[in-house]
């Protein structure tokens, strides 16, 4: 299958964003022969035209300082790409300041050989009702819909969520990953590829790892949104400004994840949550999911953070330690 990434668009993006950091074509070839791709010292941004999503997505790639990308680099595909860099069009006008996180990791007494591939979500405006609906539809695991007991709720998910243009998981596996492998001269698989997300981004991340265990070896979810949405609240959201959880959706997600317990072999999963706002609903479901995800030969970290909620300011504080734990197992999880 031909790469969905336009060669012209990528060339222009590379020349515009990181001209000084990229080698010449000749240097690229020699580096490839030596088993390493060009070093990135800034954010590389380019666009992919997705046939699956029928949309164009901006991709941002950033690595730790002084790291040459190769098969030894730990790559993380991250949802809600704008949230990592641009506070002007993100939830609550805040960003995770990824560059500061990577610098923090590089100063630790260990190698932080990692790169983050941040994919912009369908939420172009950062706050629009329709944009948020499409983002939710893309990030909700499609195969979990079968486990929703309420027939009306299940029908709603079938009509709104389960559509070809909302299949973000297929986009990641069939379009994004082959593009990254081609551009950066790498082979991505469970030994060097993880996935990270916040809220709904954490939900689709765990789903991707479990449905594609040969591709993803780790998953990081910060304040993963386990409880879905109450459809009545959601339809009235523009008026009421409030949205509550759906226990039936949460139960469906637990049943969906339970079928993958055998896929947890040799997997690494980080899950955290707070006790404010939406996060206050999560603990009962997290405890049940912990029993599903915990196996003899898996690595699982589940952490609760007191007085923290469903906001980027809290995720920003926790991102570095989550990434470091996946690579080095250097924080206490209890």
What kind of region is each of these model predictions?
Residues 20-21:
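C-terminal motif of bacterial Sec signal peptides marking the signal peptidase cleavage site
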Residues 1-9:
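Bacterial N-terminal signal peptides that target proteins for export
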Residues 26-334:
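Non-catalytic cap/lid and distal C-terminal segments of serine-dependent acyl enzymes
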């Amino acid at each position: 299958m031909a790469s969905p990434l336009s060669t012209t668009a990528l060339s222009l993006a590379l020349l515009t964003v990181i001209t000084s950091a990229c080698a010449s074509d000749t240097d690229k070839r020699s580096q490839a022969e030596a088993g390493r791709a060009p070093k990135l010292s800034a954010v590389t941004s380019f666009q992919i035209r997705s046939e699956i999503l029928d949309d164009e997505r901006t991709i941002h790639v950033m690595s730790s300082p002084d790291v040459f990308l190769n098969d030894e680099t730990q790559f993380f595909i991250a949802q809600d790409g704008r949230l990592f860099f641009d506070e002007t069009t993100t939830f609550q006008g805040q960003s995770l300041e990824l560059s500061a996180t990577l610098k923090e990791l590089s100063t630790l007494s260990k190698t932080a050989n990692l790169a983050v591939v941040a994919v912009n979500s369908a939420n172009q405006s950062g706050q629009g009702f329709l944009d948020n609906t499409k983002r939710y539809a893309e990030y909700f695991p499609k195969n979990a819909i079968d486990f929703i007991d309420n027939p009306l709720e299940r029908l709603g998910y079938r009509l709104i969520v389960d559509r070809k243009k909302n299949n973000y998981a297929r986009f990641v596996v069939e379009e994004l990953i082959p593009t990254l492998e081609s551009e950066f001269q790498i082979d991505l698989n469970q030994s060097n590829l993880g996935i990270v997300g916040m809220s709904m981004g954490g939900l689709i991340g765990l789903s991707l790892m479990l449905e594609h265990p040969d591709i993803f070896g780790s998953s990081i979810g910060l304040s993963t949104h386990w409880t879905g949405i109450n459809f009545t609240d959601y339809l009235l959201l523009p008026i009421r400004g409030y949205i509550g959880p759906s226990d039936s959706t949460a139960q469906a997600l637990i049943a969906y994840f339970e079928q993958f317990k055998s896929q947890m072999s040799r997997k690494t999963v980080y899950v955290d949550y707070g006790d404010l706002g939406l996060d206050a609903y999560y603990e009962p479901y997290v405890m049940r999911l912990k029993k599903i995800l915990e196996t003899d030969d898996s690595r699982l970290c589940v952490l609760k953070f007191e007085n923290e909620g469903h906001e980027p300011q809290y995720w920003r504080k926790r991102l570095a330690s989550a990434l470091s734990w996946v690579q080095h197992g250097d924080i206490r999880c209890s």
